[in-house]
């Protein structure tokens, strides 16, 4: 039976926390700006780590520039994190842009827009929404 948390998963979680702190506090590169570390996948032999990051930018060129800046500083970031973690081998860092947060926000906005459009159409045609029907029933019970 496998352990609930494998060693690589524990290391990935600690690496994610340390990377987030280093990127927020120690990185002074203005090209990077505010970055969020969403996830870290560490290879089984601990030689590589894929670091999934998100920026508050939607422009693809800016995102590519920020990822390139992180990749260029990967050695420096790796050395800062290595000083904080007790590992014999510090994984080589590869930064990857994670668009899931931006896509999730986009989908949420689309759903909200569709709901508000439906409610507006229902009001135009005189159809009560579920919330309005509940209010009418409550008033009739009194």
UniProtKB/Swiss-Prot annotation:
Please give the biological process terms from Gene Ontology that the record holds. Answer: maturation of SSU-rRNA
Gene Ontology CC? cytosol
Q: Where in the cell is it found?
A: Cytoplasm
Principal localization reads cytoplasm
Q: Which Gene3D superfamilies match?
A: 3.30.300.20
**A Pfam family assignment:** RBFA
Mind telling me which InterPro entries this protein's record contains? KH_dom-like_a/b (IPR015946), RbfA (IPR000238), RbfA_dom_sf (IPR023799), Ribosome-bd_factorA_CS (IPR020053)
Superkingdom, natural source: Bacteria
Residue ranges of the region described as Disordered = 119-142
Q: Per its record, what are the GO molecular function terms?
A: ribosomal small subunit binding
Question: What keywords would UniProt list here?
Answer: Cytoplasm, Ribosome biogenesis
User: Which PANTHER family does the annotation name?
Assistant: RIBOSOME-BINDING FACTOR A, CHLOROPLASTIC-RELATED
Q: How does it assemble?
A: Monomer. Binds 30S ribosomal subunits, but not 50S ribosomal subunits or 70S ribosomes.
UniProt function note:
One of several proteins that assist in the late maturation steps of the functional core of the 30S ribosomal subunit. Associates with free 30S ribosomal subunits (but not with 30S subunits that are part of 70S ribosomes or polysomes). Required for efficient processing of 16S rRNA. May interact with the 5'-terminal helix region of 16S rRNA.
- Per its UniProt record, what NCBIfam families does this chain match? rbfA
Q: What family name appears in the similarity comment?
A: Belongs to the RbfA family.
Which protein are we looking at?
Ribosome-binding factor A
Q: What is the native source organism of this protein?
A: Shewanella halifaxensis (strain HAW-EB4)
Q: Which gene encodes it?
A: rbfA
């Amino acid at each position: 039976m496998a352990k609930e948390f494998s060693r690589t998963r524990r290391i990935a979680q600690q690496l994610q926390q340390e990377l987030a702190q280093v990127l927020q506090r120690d990185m002074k590169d203005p090209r990077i700006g505010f970055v969020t570390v969403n996830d870290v996948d560490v290879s089984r032999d601990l030689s590589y780590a894929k670091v999934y990051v998100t920026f508050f930018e939607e422009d693809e060129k800016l995102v590519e520039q920020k990822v390139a800046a992180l990749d260029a500083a990967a050695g420096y970031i790796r050395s800062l994190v290595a000083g904080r973690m007790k590992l014999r081998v510090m994984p080589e860092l590869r930064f990857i842009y994670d668009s899931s947060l931006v896509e999730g926000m986009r989908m949420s906005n689309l759903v909200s827009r569709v709901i508000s459009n439906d409610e507006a159409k229902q009001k135009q045609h005189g159809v009560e929404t579920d919330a309005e029907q509940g209010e009418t029933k409550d008033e009739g019970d009194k």
